[in-house]
């Protein structure tokens, strides 16, 4: 636990807050501006550290706690470890109802903290100080377990939190915990190897589990050794460099047609560390009806999906052991040639999309291309909901391993800015770039100030198309009328008002600038890298 993100209220300031102040030189506390933003930043931090470090988020009872429920959902959907600690109502119930308490007439032990139950892996309410001796080791073990990883919640009733307790000295002994690497069953490995040897058109789907297993190098070696084309999920993007000969692009709804052309013709899919969500599988329409699946996953729940041959184990170790069984087996020249042709199609497609066509405003793809040119190999790029996930998934050619974060598990608007703060905190020696739409900016922007307050700089590119354009396209494309998505189609006399994002960002302390052309954007990105604090670049884009 390298740090705490906190907003203090009466439910935590006189207990946990007091203790944190006494140990301020040992564990830093970063002041949040919004409890949801804190949680989103902590989730992004966990992803940027590849689940090797965990932040704590603490809030008061009531609205401070419920504000974190959405962030817990993000962490839960993306299998990311975050420890949420909220104040709770009095265990004794003597002062009930306390400030911010929601009363349940027929269930007096229920509080709003019970809302965390569906969105965390581990939930506990500490009703006696001694319970920490049991609860804390269990939740830490869960958050470090690749098969069970996710957020945890502790509720601290205000009277219990204020109690003194003589914890045994050995409870505070320093412990070094290793992330376990489970080994797959030998029979399952043999079955998977047989299926691969028998296949004519195999393809690997690389998911986020590749990153968390630190399996990228092994995946690259195994794919090249056996001639396996590799497509990536959104969470698995940057598992391979875009220049790797086995890289075949991003698949799925937000992916590229060229990559999907490989997947649709595959007779065997080797899914590595992926949940196989609907945007990855096209709601299972991407695959042939007779396609077989081998699923390598630390979590049995995921490995069993879609009737796959489940190989339950650590991705890195399982790929290595599977390659040993395959020995000198290599896929057919015809299949390798098809994948290579699709790869050429993908490169040509992206090159055309990001090129300057002389028209204004710029397209999303052109903005992505400009940021890509400005980024160094080890820089980090981040986005989330709306149209940008598809644009970055297709148009971002990964220059470095594990340098890409698109929150598309919970698809949470607002993750972009808060997440950039957390990622910048996790990777202070590289530049973090975040791309955000105007809708998400308006939904959650206060962590621009949080990043300046804490000194964790990032570069934010705001793509302004005056509304929720991607949902507008879905609305109209499915036969509906344009309504309540674009500003021009919204109800009210202010529908023609455009937000001055540059001025707003400047008011939060950021360097900020408006740009309109690719040259202006390139110059602004170069200047932002030299600035001493967060920079915001605003560009109007096509709908």
Question: How would you name each of these model-derived features?
Answer:
Residues 37, 366, 449:
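Active-site phosphate/pyrophosphate-handling residues
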Residues 158-161, 388, 543:
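Short, internal active-site loops enriched in acidic
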